[in-house]
Amino acid sequence: QLLENHPKLKLQLNTLDTRQNLLRSNIDLDIRVGNDLDPNVIARRLAPSIRILCAAPTYIERKGAPASLVDLHNHQCLFIKETDYPLGTWKLENRNKEHTVKLRPHLSSNNSEIIKLWTLQGHGIMMHSLWDVLDYLKQGELLHVMPDYWERADIFGVYPARLTQSSKVKACFDYLEEELVGMLPLEEIEAITQYSYDPY
């Protein structure tokens, strides 16, 4: 649809789980999930999103569900290894308070799909974007662990300053905003966080 509306637009899509240097990599627009943004880039929020803790029923049957943040130390926690984020750290929000939990990773990978696969196989607890695990939760393949805790992880578009007035970047932003709001589980996000989100 984007290319139909803007036939002169040239697109190259790269999918990576690690943050890129926009200038060095010659990237016009980078889609990032998470509120820990580099202050040296220009960012625009595209849509609200959160990450939640979840595990497979087989893991919960074997190990039980954690009863508190401290209890997470007794569990097998799976982490996405990011170059600019400390491995083994979760920043969880509860009742308007942020809690930083530092854990020893049981397994880690720089690929979020691998972490999701390990979790589905019952290897431990992961923190993952709600929109990416919602179907697994509905089907019972994953269970929501410690549902009172979550991490704010909005979806942002990030671009270099030289493209501030770029019509092609604006066209991409407008398209992504409209598409994401229709795709993301806003009602579920509000139910978990007790916040009312402005879609834009």
Show where each model-derived region lies.
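Central regulatory/effector-binding core of bacterial HTH transcription factors
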Residues: 1-39, 191-195
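Short beta-strand-to-loop elements that line the ligand-binding cleft
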Residues: 11-15, 101-111
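Hydrophobic residues within well-ordered alpha-helices
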Residues: 22, 72, 117-122, 137
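Paired acidic/hydrophobic, glycine-rich loop segments that form the ligand-binding mouth/hinge
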Residues: 29-32, 124-128, 144
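Flexible hinge/capping segments at coil-to-helix
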Residues: 40-50, 55-80, 95
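Short beta-strand->loop
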Residues: 43-46, 139-151
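Ligand-binding cleft/hinge of the Venus flytrap
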Residues: 88-102, 136
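C-terminal effector-binding regulatory domain of bacterial HTH transcription factors
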Residues: 130-139, 149-200
